[in-house]
């Protein structure tokens, strides 16, 4: 890309957004299964509406999972403790509609399907997954999505600590960044909509959210300007929220979960899925690969696509795109990737140590750009450089 002026916008939603409530419940169920039975097969979906949480899907596990307790504890942890907030963890109905995994799927995953793949763990489904990394932030993530997550994470902290006592759980933000080529040069626009108690005045709400939430988070980036535009609760009121205001469903925030629209998405959601589902595990591996490519200074931007067929124990395709920023040809990077990384479903699980109860923490504020997760390590840079030579 030339050094043209351009703008890119990404949004995030808070842990109290109805869809994120559902993601967190689904991943908490997954964690409960993996904690006692790492071989659990889980595809857990959650639906939340007025006074109701419904948990369904396919689970095969050797442990007992208390769906009622998990759903209520997650809602309480988020802050849904009063019907006025959009949901009450104590009085809401919780329905359990879970059943076991299809044996037709299971035989492909367990290595008991076609003779040519006997004994090898196959992919849990077909599909393509993308990973992305760039040098816009220290986390090697796109700036708009990282900034959006950071604002909402800080707002939730102030809400839970009652520093801003009139905030309620539901919120979302959207940030537009001005670029010169691929370089962020200014935060152009910040949109923040936050649920609140009915008695707070709009002027106080707007001033507080700008000066006590947005500026403390985004100020240190050096990208806020005097003419940065702020749109705070643009309708003027956001009292009704949570599942009462909008129905929630697992897997409806896949762009929030990944790169904010910068970098492609294969379409598969993450939450509620055990690591045999390549929708999740291969997307994590693709991020791991792309981040190591960028950290190794082989490119300033990198997108990796992996593709799988159900029951097949290896990727059917691998693709690399450096958007013209590569220091070496893409075919060389692709060849090095195939040498350095084990992209088989079993290899991904082993490399990233994915049969652990780590998933509930991924289910709000993005799955990427967070150093606590194994797919964010940059421990393959030297191996990649060596493989390039």
From Swiss-Prot:
Q: Which GO terms describe its cellular component?
A: cytoplasm
Organism's domain of life?
Bacteria
Pathway assigned in UniProt: Amino-acid biosynthesis; S-adenosyl-L-methionine biosynthesis; S-adenosyl-L-methionine from L-methionine: step 1/1
What detail does the entry give on cofactor binding? Binds 2 divalent ions per subunit.
User: EC no.?
Assistant: 2.5.1.6
At which positions is K(+) bound?
A: 45
Mind listing the GO molecular function terms for this protein?
ATP binding; magnesium ion binding; methionine adenosyltransferase activity
In this chain, ATP is annotated as bound at 17, 170-172, 237-238, 246, 252-253, 269, 273
Question: Tell me, what's a Pfam family for it?
Answer: S-AdoMet_synt_N
Identify which cofactors the protein needs according to its UniProt entry.
Mg(2+); K(+)
EC class of this enzyme?
Answer: transferase
Indicate the principal place this protein occupies in or around the cell: cytoplasm
Alphabetical list of HAMAP family matching this protein: S_AdoMet_synth1 (MF_00086)
Give the UniProt family note.
Belongs to the AdoMet synthase family.
The record's annotation in PANTHER family points to: S-ADENOSYLMETHIONINE SYNTHETASE
Subunit (UniProt): Homotetramer; dimer of dimers.
Supply the name of the protein. Answer: S-adenosylmethionine synthase
Q: Which organism is it from?
A: Treponema denticola (strain ATCC 35405 / DSM 14222 / CIP 103919 / JCM 8153 / KCTC 15104)
Q: What is the name of the gene encoding this protein? A: metK
């Amino acid at each position: 890309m030339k050094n043209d002026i351009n703008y890119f916008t990404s949004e995030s939603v808070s842990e109290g957004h109805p869809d994120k409530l559902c993601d967190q419940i689904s991943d908490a169920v997954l964690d409960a299964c993996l904690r006692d039975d790492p071989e659990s097969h889980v595809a857990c979906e959650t639906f939340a509406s007025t006074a109701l949480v419904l948990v369904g899907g396919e689970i095969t596990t050797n442990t007992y999972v208390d769906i009622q307790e998990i759903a209520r504890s997650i809602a309480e942890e988020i802050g849904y403790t009063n019907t006025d907030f959009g949901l009450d963890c104590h009085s809401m109905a919780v329905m359990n509609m879970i059943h076991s995994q299809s044996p037709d799927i299971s035989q492909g995953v367990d290595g008991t399907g076609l003779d040519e793949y006997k004994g090898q763990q196959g992919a849990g489904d077909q599909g393509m997954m993308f990973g992305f990394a760039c040098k816009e932030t220290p986390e090697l993530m796109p700036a708009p999505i990282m900034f959006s997550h950071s604002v909402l994470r800080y707002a939730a902290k102030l809400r839970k600590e009652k520093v801003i006592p009139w905030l309620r759980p539901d919120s979302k933000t959207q940030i537009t960044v001005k670029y010169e080529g691929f370089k962020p040069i200014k935060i152009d626009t910040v949109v923040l909509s936050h649920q609140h108690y009915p008695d707070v005045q709009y002027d106080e709400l707007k001033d507080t959210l700008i000066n006590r939430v947005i500026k403390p988070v985004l100020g240190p980036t050096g990208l806020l300007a005097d003419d940065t535009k702020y749109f705070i609760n643009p309708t003027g009121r956001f009292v009704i929220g949570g599942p009462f205001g909008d129905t929630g469903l697992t897997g409806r925030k896949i762009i929030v979960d990944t790169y904010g629209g910068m970098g492609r998405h294969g379409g598969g959601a993450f939450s509620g899925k055990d690591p045999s589902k390549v929708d999740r595990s291969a997307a994590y591996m693709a991020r791991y690969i792309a981040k190591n490519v960028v950290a190794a200074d082989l490119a300033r931007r990198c997108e990796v696509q992996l593709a799988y067929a159900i029951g097949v124990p290896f990727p059917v395709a691998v693709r690399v795109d450096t958007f013209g920023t590569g220091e070496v040809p893409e075919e060389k990077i692709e060849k090095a990737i195939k040498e350095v990384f084990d992209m088989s479903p079993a290899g991904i699980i082993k490399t990233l140590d994915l049969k652990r109860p780590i998933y509930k923490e991924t289910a709000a504020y993005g799955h990427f750009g967070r150093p606590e997760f194994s797919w964010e390590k940059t421990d393959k840079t030297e191996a990649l450089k060596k493989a390039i030579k």
